[in-house]
């Protein structure tokens, strides 16, 4: 079977339990089955599952397509372990609730229909598929589904230190040592916590031309400090997140120093005087702008519902000519990366804005089909029992040519914003609001020592992007989670270089 190495982030291979506490059932079977075209059924030892899940799902798809023009099946299972250590002791628990299920989807010629089963039992899957087939009439053909080229492939996260190779007790002991390094006897500190969360996700997608499987390991390692000074709360926070192994599960001396420094500085922040400022965004704030401005606003399911003003600006200027913005699920090891989306499209970069021109929205299969546009690998779901939507992955501004020090030196009277908290956008009106961690006062290109928190930026998307006058040559991605409105959460990153612009801050 052919191998695929997408920026060295995923490789073909078998699966091992990343969490060491929650056994996901079919990893070895899935990846082994993905290496052959054989339709022969077999029993996977130790799973109680009779035969290849890939073969079962392929048979279901083939049967549904005797009536409908297009059918798919996707399997998702997640499980993991969380270890934490604070001043009260140590805790080991499941990381979230283990989940497992299959979604079966059909296109009747005019619209999509779907059913989901919280099981991988062949009997349950075939029964659900039969009911969907029986109760859904075949419609007249109004749209044509794009068939992707044939591909049968498996992937697995690249790791330098596989968590499965280190017993859970040894990992807990390492966390004890790190807690001792992070703990601080400053009387203002009330709580210190370090934690490691590891989640393994198995994913399968099957349609007539695709049999895809992946096993990914997501690790999040966090240090947190909280306390008070004269009634004012303060905190420090450092974390390493990505699709990787235990090589990420470590805070170095610089991380711990930054954790303590951020805690101390947060105790002396003041509210920012509201006004319009010349500003420089640190990469994580640039990413928040990217995510909220030309992330949600160009998810193309909003075009179908006529809920996105960006639809009026396709192939038109929306930003400074210095701005190029991308979404790329193939970035090596990033939290928002994946080998293929939940509709079988393999990962590749999508240029959303090029030299200030809005050139391509993010699509799922439904929006691309109904609007007749090029398809991007952005059809994503939160879990096996949720709908697929057009979603971001890793969304960021491309590097520019300016040294970040030049951006700061150019500020005669302004703010340097860093850290991020949250954001929201109105796709219909194209208003945006997001909150950074802190804003440092800058005069004459130098910090004055005044720190404001939390600064909130508001404005009209094309105006903020159009005001960008300098783009740094650095690049950083920050991990996060993204909801579709108030629900449908998926893993993402956002970032880019430093940016200089003008914005309303309060």
Label every model-predicted segment.
Residues 2-6, 10-506:
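N-terminal small-residue-enriched
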């Amino acid at each position: 079977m052919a191998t695929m190495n997408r920026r060295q982030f995923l490789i073909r291979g078998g699966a091992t339990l990343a969490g060491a506490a929650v056994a996901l059932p079919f990893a070895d079977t899935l990846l082994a089955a993905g290496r052959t075209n054989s339709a022969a059924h077999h029993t996977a030892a130790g799973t109680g599952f009779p035969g290849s899940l890939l073969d079962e799902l392929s048979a279901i798809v083939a049967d549904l397509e005797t009536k409908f023009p297009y059918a798919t099946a996707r399997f998702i299972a997640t499980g993991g372990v969380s270890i934490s250590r604070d001043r009260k002791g140590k805790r080991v628990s499941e990381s979230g609730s283990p989940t497992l299920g299959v979604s079966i989807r059909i296109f009747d010629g005019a619209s999509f229909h779907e059913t989901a089963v919280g099981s991988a039992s062949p009997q349950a899957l075939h029964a659900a598929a039969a009911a969907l087939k029986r109760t859904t009439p075949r419609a007249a053909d109004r749209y044509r589904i794009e068939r992707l080229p044939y591909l049968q492939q498996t992937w697995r996260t690249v790791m330098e230190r596989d968590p499965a190779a280190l017993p859970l007790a040894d990992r807990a002991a390492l966390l004890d040592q790190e807690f001792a390094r992070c703990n601080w006897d400053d009387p203002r500190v009330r709580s210190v916590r370090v934690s490691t969360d590891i989640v393994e996700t198995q994913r399968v997608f099957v349609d007539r031309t695709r049999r895809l499987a992946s096993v990914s390991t997501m690790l999040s390692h966090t240090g947190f400090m909280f306390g008070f000074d004269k009634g004012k709360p303060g905190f420090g926070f450092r974390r390493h997140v990505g699709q990787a192994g235990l090589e990420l599960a470590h805070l170095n001396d610089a991380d711990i120093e930054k954790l303590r420094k951020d805690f101390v500085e947060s105790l002396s922040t003041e509210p920012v005087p509201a006004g319009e400022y010349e500003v420089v965004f640190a990469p994580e704030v640039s990413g928040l702008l990217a995510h909220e401005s030309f992330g949600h606003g160009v998810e193309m399911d909003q075009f179908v519902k006529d809920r996105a003003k960006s639809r009026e600006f396709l192939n038109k200027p929306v930003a400074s000519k210095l701005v190029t913005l991308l979404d790329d699920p193939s970035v090596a090891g990033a939290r928002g990366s994946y080998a293929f989306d939940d509709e079988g499209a393999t990962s590749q970069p999508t240029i959303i804005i090029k030299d200030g021109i809005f050139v391509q929205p993010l699509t799922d299969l439904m929006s691309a089909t109904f609007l007749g546009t090029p398809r991007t690998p952005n059809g994503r779901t939160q879990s096996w029992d949720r709908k697929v939507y057009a979603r971001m992955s890793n969304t960021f501004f491309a590097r520019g040519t300016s040294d970040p020090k030049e951006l700061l030196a150019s500020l005669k009277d302004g703010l340097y914003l860093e850290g991020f908290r949250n954001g929201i956008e109105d796709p219909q009106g194209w208003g945006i609001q997001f909150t950074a961690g802190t804003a440092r006062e800058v005069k004459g290109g130098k910090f004055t020592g005044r720190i404001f928190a939390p600064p909130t930026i508001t404005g009209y998307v094309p105006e903020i992007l159009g005001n960008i006058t300098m783009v740094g040559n650095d690049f950083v991605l920050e991990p996060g989670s993204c909801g579709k409105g108030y629900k449908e959460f998926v893993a993402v990153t956002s970032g880019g270089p430093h940016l200089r612009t003008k914005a309303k801050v309060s």
